[in-house]
UniProtKB/Swiss-Prot annotation:
It comes from Rattus norvegicus. This is Potassium channel subfamily K member 2. Residues 266-271 are annotated as: Selectivity filter 2. Changing T156C: No effect on voltage-dependent channel gating. The chain crosses the membrane at residues 62-82, 172-192, 223-243, 288-308.
Amino acid sequence: MLASASRERPGYTAGVAAPDLLDPKSAAQNSKPRLSFSAKPTVLASRVESDSAINVMKWKTVSTIFLVVVLYLIIGATVFKALEQPQEISQRTTIVIQKQNFIAQHACVNSTELDELIQQIVTAINAGIIPLGNNSNQVSHWDLGSSFFFAGTVITTIGFGNISPRTEGGKIFCIIYALLGIPLFGFLLAGVGDQLGTIFGKGIAKVEDTFIKWNVSQTKIRIISTIIFILFGCVLFVALPAVIFKHIEGWSALDAIYFVVITLTTIGFGDYVAGGSDIEYLDFYKPVVWFWILVGLAYFAAVLSMIGDWLRVISKKTKEEVGEFRAHAAEWTANVTAEFKETRRRLSVEIYDKFQRATSVKRKLSAELAGNHNQELTPCRRTLSVNHLTSEREVLPPLLKAESIYLNGLTPHCAAEDIAVIENMK
């Protein structure tokens, strides 16, 4: 069966192991699909499987990431609660005591009137009006410069929240304006990010050329150039603007850095907003701040894109290593299977040949003994005849040892006397 199976397989050659699927010479003679002709083997897969493996994240991975994010949120909530809740309780207690002291000192004002005044103040603050001083100290939040800055926060999706449309017409226009402006700003941000990436890329290339002259490894060069790129961007778009805001807005260094990071990451809490106080040249100051936001966002987008490229490269290398391992495992399995099949085929052929030889010897012995049954048989020949007749339905196992043939039922002494008979019949 094995021999027939080997003849049915096209291109099968007895005694030859499976062709090396990674060897170009042997692969050139084999028309069947192979792993690869390159030095780095890859695993064959259909286009659908490869696309799904590349573009679709597995549910197990999604679930793991989801659990990590939830755990991260729980940790953040715990830390923020521990840091901020005592301050909130202190502020609530302080305002209650101040209200009681104010009512005690001003008997003409009752608690209801005071609450109404406080509610109006809260409403004014929510509308972007700070009820301090007189009208001469008030700054409009809807002049041309402030409106330009607000429109910029809409399309950049920062949304500080210090001011917002209060009229129905303003809300409707803001919806339409955001839906059209956000994609437009996305194209602009991508273009500016590409230009910044090109500029920084040229600078990084010069730095790498300098380090190459010093015989530094490529990995160290890449790490050093990346660190220089990030540090230069942080100085240009974070540290320097923070110093400017600290000087112009009168904030502390921590508040200035806090505003810069919260703004450029498009979080935009709105607790700190540039241009919120009475500043000279305010109409020009806010548009300049918006252009800084544009370039800073482009820089952060370039950094995030670079990090994404790193992750893709790492993922690609990991997949290549796994694919190479699988290819070698498949090659090893194929070779072992081929060798096992070849060994089994050879054993089958040898056993079959020996069986045929034993059958032929048995037939010749039967014919010889049948022709000489009237002759006088020696005790050894009589033993051979009896054993042959009783074992006619069994296979006569040939035993080859020291180039001498011993038949079942013969002692070495008898075999020595009749060995010539067997040799003549072979």
